[in-house]
Structures are given as structure tokens and as C-alpha cells.
Amino acid sequence: MSNLENLTSKIIEDANKEAEKLLSEAKKEENEIVDEKVKKANKAKEQIIEKTKREAKTKAERVISNTHLKVRNNKLEAKQEMINKVFDEAVIKLQNLPQEEYLNFIKNSILSLDIEGDEEIIVSSNDKDKIDISFMLTLNNKLKDKGKKELLKISNENRDIKGGFILYKNGIEINNSFEALVDSLRDELEQEIIEALFS
């Protein structure tokens, strides 16, 4: 073989070796890049899964918390409804007092107040006919016995109240309607009613 052939053969052989080496390095680099991308993709996937789990947990906790809040609010509303019903029933019982008891209530309530004795008694239109002249004379005599004026009179005005009365004089009112009396006791009695109903 001639030197030229040897040289050509050597160049081709070296070129083939260099090509194989370059291909091998390229393949290795490709594998490293692919491995790195796979690692990054797996890490990103894990982060996405972890983030999704956290978000799902947070959302679930929020839903549970909102549900607990709604249940608690519903219970409170139901309790408040029952308490309101108790107070409404108290007003109804007062409305259904026999006439004699009702008039005694009005008389005793008025006599217990620090009044001058020349006020007007405002009642509902339903109660206007229950209070007659005889009742007013008796009431005014009792006021006189206490050293008060005996000028108490029934007002021509009616009020939309469920019972009881309102005393009026010079723009000042003392509200002794059944609703006002029950409401005035509400704060005092509400805790007792809650304990009686829900214990």
C-alpha cells in the first residue's frame, strides 16, 4: 500500500473515530439534558401536586369552616325564634287576662308609678270599652288618697298596642303596653329562658 493510501486510510479512520467520539458525547449530552428535563418535569409535577393538595386542603377547611358557621348560625336563629315565641306567648297570655285581672293590672300599675294624677291613659281601640267611668272614678279616688291630683282621664287617641296602656302628659309618655313590659324584662329573663329551653 502506498503512503497516500495509508494517509487517506488514517485520515478516514481518525475522522470515523472523531465522529464516533462526537456522536458519543452528543448522545451523552442528550441523555444528560433529557435526564435534567425529566428531573425538572418531575419536580414541577411534585410541586404542582403539592400545591394542588394544599389548595384542596385549604378549600376543604374553608368549606368545613363555613359549614360549621352556617350550622351555628342556624342553631342561633332557631334558639332566637324559640325565645321570641316564648315572649310572644307571654304577650298573648297577658292579652287573654280576664277583664277583672286586666283592670286590676292597669290600676295597680298606674298607682305604682310616680305620676301627678292629671295624665291621659292611651289604650288600644280593643281595650277602650273595658275602661268605664266607674273604673276611672275608683282610680282617681285612689290617686287622691295618695295625695295626687284626681284628673286622670282616658285619651281620645288610640295606639296600636296589644294591651296595657301608655300614660301621656306634655309630650312625655310612659309606655306600659304589654309589648314594652315584656321587652323590658327580656334582657333579664333571656338567659333563664335559654337555660330552661336548651339545658
UniProtKB/Swiss-Prot annotation:
<dbReference type="GO" id="GO:0005524">
    <property type="term" value="F:ATP binding"/>
</dbReference>
<dbReference type="GO" id="GO:0042777">
    <property type="term" value="P:proton motive force-driven plasma membrane ATP synthesis"/>
</dbReference>
<dbReference type="Pfam" id="PF01991">
    <property type="entry name" value="vATP-synt_E"/>
</dbReference>
<dbReference type="InterPro" id="IPR038495">
    <property type="entry name" value="ATPase_E_C"/>
</dbReference>
<keyword id="KW-0066">ATP synthesis</keyword>
<protein>
    <recommendedName>
        <fullName>V-type proton ATPase subunit E</fullName>
    </recommendedName>
</protein>
<dbReference type="GO" id="GO:0046933">
    <property type="term" value="F:proton-transporting ATP synthase activity, rotational mechanism"/>
</dbReference>
<keyword id="KW-0813">Transport</keyword>
<dbReference type="InterPro" id="IPR002842">
    <property type="entry name" value="ATPase_V1_Esu"/>
</dbReference>
<keyword id="KW-0406">Ion transport</keyword>
<comment type="similarity">
    <text>Belongs to the V-ATPase E subunit family.</text>
</comment>
<dbReference type="GO" id="GO:0046961">
    <property type="term" value="F:proton-transporting ATPase activity, rotational mechanism"/>
</dbReference>
<comment type="function">
    <text>Produces ATP from ADP in the presence of a proton gradient across the membrane.</text>
</comment>
<keyword id="KW-0375">Hydrogen ion transport</keyword>
<dbReference type="GO" id="GO:0033178">
    <property type="term" value="C:proton-transporting two-sector ATPase complex, catalytic domain"/>
</dbReference>
<dbReference type="InterPro" id="IPR028987">
    <property type="entry name" value="ATP_synth_B-like_membr_sf"/>
</dbReference>
